């Protein structure tokens, strides 16, 4: 999984009946797992015939007499008076084995028919039973329980926290419990400063809170595998849905320029869809990881990596693509073989190979550096100056779509954010774009503007993706 919170079926301890909640120790600063242990006195219905357990369970479930506590199996083993092991069913906490007044008509009926016998049962609960939310709620101060820290990002075996200041005194406790409760996690880190505060490569300073000091991860996304040192590249698991959304806008055989490609979360999945991509990133380690991902996911024919400055890459790549030698990728159909013999299965008629010819113009530009990507738009004016005859209306070739990621202030009225984004884009490309230019709006429909709300980064910070067709006045401008 790519991002996570506490397990969806893990209720907060306040949702459990009092008698099933863990012991409380709000002075704990070093995790003591042995402290979290308690015995809960219950009653159980011992079933005389083990073969009758399913029927009795169904009847007691229907009468709502069974114990209903998340993650607890109500079927238990008990010994009868002769020492024989029998199956028993734990009953709801209000039922008392020695008080018939607490028995339902169904329990009384089953006892009278000799199908069950009422027995006391001491249920032992320990640290392994309770969830992260249960345990941490028994440690944090009561005034911090309204919003316990349980939003995290998982990258491979690493859990990445971004703890608020009030939880820092408990950071090691939080990390240890999270590692215990998520078996695939081996390392827990906490971001100590904002992304990019110390590096132009969008990495961030962190502290190790629990587990191994090993950030070499294996990450899967869109059926692709990426291997990288999480401390040296940018990766955000919360963006998988957005990566998928944009890649789905690209068509087979199209040409994409991924200007700030990172390790390739757009480029490599696009290559798998038989989309040509020139993918660039300034980070040398990110470039190396992208090279590995291209090879590992077998998209060498479609994805070409570069290690350049983004602004330089925008201008250079447009000219280079137009002048470089043509490329054709041939995909031969897979040979079908008989499962038993392994022999080749003849197909009539035999399927033809697929051929994909790399375009000489980009159909899409992707600019996924939300903090500063809009600033790089000033590389587009004049990008195809003097090449007007190669584009519509003279040919069928349209100017490219630009997909630029950015942050805005998360206004109460989203239109204010859209106005802000359009103004910033307009300033950089020297051409006015307004929210009315959106598809179906009252403005300039040739712009094909759409502004997609990607995610809320913080209460006052929203991430957007603005997509628009590069205006002819910009592309052909003489500069």
Curated annotation (Swiss-Prot):
Any one GO cellular component localisation term in the record: mitochondrial matrix
Task performed by this protein: Specifically methylates the N1 position of guanosine-37 in various cytoplasmic and mitochondrial tRNAs. Methylation is not dependent on the nature of the nucleoside 5' of the target nucleoside. This is the first step in the biosynthesis of wybutosine (yW), a modified base adjacent to the anticodon of tRNAs and required for accurate decoding.
Molecular function per GO: tRNA (guanine(37)-N1)-methyltransferase activity; tRNA methyltransferase activity
Enzyme Commission identifier(s): 2.1.1.228
Residues that hold S-adenosyl-L-methionine according to the record: 243, 281-282, 309-310, 368
Reaction catalyzed: guanosine(37) in tRNA + S-adenosyl-L-methionine = N(1)-methylguanosine(37) in tRNA + S-adenosyl-L-homocysteine + H(+)
Main localization category: mitochondrion
UniProt keyword annotation of Nucleus present: yes
One annotated GO biological process: tRNA N1-guanine methylation
Family stated for the protein in its record: Belongs to the class I-like SAM-binding methyltransferase superfamily. TRM5/TYW2 family.
Name of one Pfam family that matches: TRM5-TYW2_MTfase
Organism: Aspergillus fumigatus (strain ATCC MYA-4609 / CBS 101355 / FGSC A1100 / Af293)
Cell location: Mitochondrion matrix; Nucleus; Cytoplasm
Keyword set, alphabetical order: Cytoplasm, Methyltransferase, Mitochondrion, Nucleus, S-adenosyl-L-methionine, Transferase, tRNA processing
Gene expressing this chain: trm5
Subunit architecture: Monomer.
Keyword S-adenosyl-L-methionine: yes
Name recorded for this polypeptide: tRNA (guanine(37)-N(1))-methyltransferase
């Amino acid at each position: 999984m790519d991002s996570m919170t506490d397990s969806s079926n893990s209720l907060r301890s306040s949702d459990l009946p009092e008698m099933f909640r863990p012991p409380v120790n709000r002075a704990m600063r070093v995790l003591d797992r042995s402290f979290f242990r308690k015995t809960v006195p219950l009653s159980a219905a011992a079933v005389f015939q083990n073969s009758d357990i399913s029927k009795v369970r169904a009847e007691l479930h229907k009468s709502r007499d069974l114990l209903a506590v998340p993650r607890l199996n109500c079927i238990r083993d008990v010994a009868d008076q002769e020492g024989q092991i029998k199956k028993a069913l734990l009953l709801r906490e209000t039922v008392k084995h020695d008080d018939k007044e607490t028995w339902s008509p169904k329990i009384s009926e089953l006892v009278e028919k000799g199908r069950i016998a009422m027995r006391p049962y001491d249920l032992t609960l320990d640290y392994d039973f309770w969830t992260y939310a249960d345990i941490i709620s028994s440690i944090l101060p009561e005034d911090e329980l309204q919003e316990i820290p349980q939003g995290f990002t998982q990258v491979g075996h690493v859990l990445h926290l971004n703890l608020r200041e009030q939880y820092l005194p408990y950071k090691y406790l939080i990390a240890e419990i999270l590692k215990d409760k998520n078996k695939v996690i081996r390392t827990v880190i906490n971001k100590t400063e904002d992304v990019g505060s110390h590096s132009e490569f969008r990495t961030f300073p962190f502290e190790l809170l629990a587990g191994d000091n090993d950030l070499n991860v294996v990450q899967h996304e869109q059926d692709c595998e990426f291997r990288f040192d999480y401390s040296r590249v940018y990766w955000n698991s919360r963006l998988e849905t957005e990566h998928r959304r944009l890649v789905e806008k690209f068509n087979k055989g199209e040409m994409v320029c991924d200007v700030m490609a990172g390790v390739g979360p757009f480029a490599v999945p696009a290559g798998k869809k038989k989309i040509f991509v020139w993918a660039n990133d300034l980070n040398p380690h990110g470039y190396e990881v992208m090279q590995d991902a291209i090879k590992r996911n077998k998209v060498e024919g479609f994805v070409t990596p570069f290690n350049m400055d983004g602004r330089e890459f925008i201008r250079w790549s447009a000219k280079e693509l137009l002048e470089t030698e043509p490329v054709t990728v041939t995909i031969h159909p897979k040979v079908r073989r008989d499962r038993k013999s392994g022999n080749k299965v003849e197909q009539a008629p035999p399927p033809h190979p697929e051929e994909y010819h790399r375009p000489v113009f980009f159909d899409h530009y992707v600019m996924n550096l939300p903090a500063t990507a809009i600033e790089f738009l000033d590389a587009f004016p004049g990008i195809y100056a003097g090449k007007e005859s190669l584009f519509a209306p003279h040919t069928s070739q349209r100017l490219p779509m630009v997909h630029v990621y950015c942050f805005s202030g998360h206004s109460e009225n989203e239109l204010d954010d859209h106005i802000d984004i359009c103004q910033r884009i307009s300033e950089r490309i020297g051409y006015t774009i307004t929210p009315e230019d959106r598809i179906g709006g009252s403005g300039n429909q040739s712009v094909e503007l759409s502004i997609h709300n990607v995610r809320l980064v913080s209460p006052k910070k929203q991430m957007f993706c603005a997509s628009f067709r590069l205006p002819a006045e910009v592309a052909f401008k003489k500069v």
